[in-house]
Amino acid sequence: MASREGITSGRTQKETDTTWMRFCFSIDEDAPFTRTQAQEFLADRGVSTRMVWTGNILRQPGFASIDHRSPDTGLPNCDRMMERSLSLPIHHRLNADHIGYICEQLDQMWEHYT
């Protein structure tokens, strides 16, 4: 997926030690499909997706009444993550067949929109 034009895969820094619970990726503005189209295509084929809600935490309802500081220019990179990113499931019950199916659906989605 990382090699597909219009997609930016999640990544970590060398010194980061993480446990992946979801595989996140962003759909670039020049991608042949939108986040909504990707969600609908995959959902129709039984692949669950979730929006990446952590992009701009200040846009979450729970932060509406909490005092905070933010730049006058806003947080455009955080907003972009929130608006254009999706995550795919990763958990201990997925087996090789499940992962293969998810990958096949991603390939079919790409072929459908290009």
Kindly label every feature range from the protein language model.
Residues 1-114:
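PLP-dependent aminotransferase class I/II
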